[in-house]
Amino acid sequence: MKRLNLILLYIFCLLPLAAQRPPKHEVRAAWVTAVYGLDWPRTRATTPEGIRKQQAELIEILDKLKAANFNTVLFQTRTRGDVLYKSAIEPYNSILTGKVGGNPGYDPLAFAVAECHKRGMECHAWMVTIPLGNRKHVAALGKESVTKRKPAICVPYKREYFLNPGHPQTKEYLMSLVREVVERYNVDGVHFDYLRYPEHALRFSDSYTYKKYGNGRDLAQWRRDNITEIVRYLYKGVKALKPWVKVSTCPVGKYRDTSRYP
């Protein structure tokens, strides 16, 4: 009996230690931001030397992240209606060459994936989803902008443009971009950003699609359902292509801030 009691006591003493063990696979991730060149790049890839410098700048960032014990890089792959990989759907972001659609002479996403993997880090394609940029940005994209190619799924709001989450073709358009990335690149994950309506969007111009697809739901619930459906559709689409690719999203970080969104 004493022996049994000692065994039980030993087990109970170990339980708190087991509860405090870190997860087997801890994610230590950092964003590498390309929009406005906030993190990268500083140099334009317009010459062979420019290409080498631009690549070296990214390598320097990855080396620092590796030294700081990060194991996951969220590499900005789509910004606002433009991209940082060779796409048949949207143009290259001008930050690479100084020109909208300008070919940088290499594939930034392929390069980022290869360099991350050399350092034992995962590379996730970070894709901004719903926002398409302000009027100036959209005008600069010209006929390459999705607002010109697929105006039915785009909505102007407060001097900016957005994909309309309530239009059924929006999730299909986003999936076409995701499909390019997942099928053609050895990414370890896809990370969705701004997968939500814009702030204070009570007057967001989606009344037509609401009347057509609302099916009796109140506006707020319908909008929530739209976002849920897009997330579900993209998640299932990724898993159907490559089940091992991780899917994540960047939601609003503070609960008290959620009132700003419909």
Predicted regions and their residues:
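Glycine-rich, aromatic-flanked loop segments that form ligand/cofactor-binding clefts
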Residues: 22-30, 70-81, 107-154, 191-193, ...
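Active-site-adjacent "subsite" loops/lids of carbohydrate-active enzymes
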Residues: 25, 33-56, 114, 125-184
